[in-house]
Amino acid sequence: MITLALSKGRIFDDILPLLRTAGIEVLDDPEKSRKLILGTNQPDLRVVLVRATDVPTYVQYGGADIGVVGKDTLLESGSQGLYQPLDLQIAKCRISVAVRQGFDYAAAVKQGSRLKVATKYVAISRDFFATKGVHVDLIKLYGSMELAPLTGLADAIVDLVSTGSTLKANHLIEVERIMDISSHLVVNQTALKLKQAPIRKLIDAFSLACAQAAAKQ
């Protein structure tokens, strides 16, 4: 049995077409079912639903053999012991710095001001600003990032940006793009040795599905 760890939401929705192309159908709709372990039309493959931030942990410690996770989560939480064979090119977005309209971010950086930055990406933010030589105080938040500059909690935020519509709706502007993000396939190293044939077959199926999806774009 191969266990594939997925998270609900955009990654799950975006992976479904790739699964179908690979000949895999998930038998339950996670939006309608309370099940956390879902069967598939492949008797030797099941799906477990976990929080996005927990996918690397499940794969690393053997709760799942293989998983799909955003590059942001891998960079933030660490990916020790994980084999990363494939960028699936799904759930694309970016991590960016944003500030409230009217805040002169460029001037603050040039003057060497110490900025308060709210984010859930503390490690990524720390590395980014350190590389630029910008002095920051990082404030860890878990949601509603856009509120931080509007309430005076922070001068800037570092967060995922897709279309930018949420920033615009809250009178924030994107001032720096830190990196582009997409979802990657991750594999437990021990599982790869013990279940090499079925896991390699699954990786190859995903690779072919990605190539076919790219050809249609």
From Swiss-Prot:
One of its GO terms (biological process) is L-histidine biosynthetic process. It is found in: Cytoplasm. Its main location: cytoplasm. It comes from the Bacteria. One of its GO terms (molecular function) is ATP binding. It catalyses: 1-(5-phospho-beta-D-ribosyl)-ATP + diphosphate = 5-phospho-alpha-D-ribose 1-diphosphate + ATP. SUPFAM superfamilies: Periplasmic binding protein-like II. InterPro entries: ATP_PRibTrfase_cat, ATP_PRibTrfase_CS, ATP_PRibTrfase_HisG, ATP_PRibTrfase_HisG_short. One of its GO terms (cellular component) is cytoplasm. Pathway: Amino-acid biosynthesis; L-histidine biosynthesis; L-histidine from 5-phospho-alpha-D-ribose 1-diphosphate: step 1/9. The keyword ATP-binding applies. Belongs to the ATP phosphoribosyltransferase family. Short subfamily. Catalyzes the condensation of ATP and 5-phosphoribose 1-diphosphate to form N'-(5'-phosphoribosyl)-ATP (PR-ATP). Has a crucial role in the pathway because the rate of histidine biosynthesis seems to be controlled primarily by regulation of HisG enzymatic activity. Heteromultimer composed of HisG and HisZ subunits. This is ATP phosphoribosyltransferase. It comes from Polaromonas naphthalenivorans (strain CJ2).
